[in-house]
Each structure stands twice: as C-alpha cells, then as structure tokens.
Amino acid sequence: QNFITLAQKGFYKNLTFHRVIKDFMIQGGDPSGNGTGGPGYSFEDELNPATESYKQGYVKGVVAMANAGPNTNGSQFFIMLKDTHLPPSYTIFGKVISGQNVVDTIGNIKTNASDKPSESVIIKEVTVSSK
C-alpha cells in the first residue's frame, strides 16, 4: 500500500535509479539520489512465505522494497534483472508487467565503482495496476 500511495501522489516522478548492478537489479525511489533518503518514515517488513510471490522468489521483473535491515522500508525499491537467490528479507509487492525491455536497458547502463549510473536514469512516471 505504501508504494501505491507514494506513486499516486507523484512521489517517484523525476527521481532516479541511483544504483544499477548488472545481471542483478536496479534500485530507485530515493529523493536524495544516493541511497540514503526516503519519505521521512519507515514501516515494518511485510514478509509472508506462504504467498505465491515468496514461493517464486526474487525472479526477473519482481519489484521489492529495498531496506537497510529489518523494518526499515520507506520509498526505495528494486527491480530484479534476472532470477537471483536472496534471503526472504525484502518485501515483494509487485512485478513488471509491461516495459521489462526498459528495465533491461537500464540494467546495462554504464556505472561507476559504487554502482551509480554514469548518466542520470530518471523515472518519468510510475503506474500501478492490478492483474
């Protein structure tokens, strides 16, 4: 619900994908643009191993909350570039249903040693739909 509310309020508009790790994931949603920012609050993890998304795991196209440890979710999220085994510590809340080619293109952008893209990758719009 947090992501949906922020998206509907336009929170993500003009933010960047500040972290790109080839063949792993892209991360965005930080208003400071460096991985330290958020909406001004945090919320608890919503981890439910019984759900289908957790049974499938962190597969290509999955969208999950980025965090700095348990119960530190805010506005930052990541999108998986390929199927990857991760501990179930990140709240999965969606999957890319359109535009995975754009995600893949971002995943191949040149980055510096800190995984920051050499050129800004700006989020123009976030659209949430239910399937």
Where are these regions (language model features)?
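Cyclophilin-like peptidyl-prolyl cis-trans isomerases
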Residues: Q1-K131
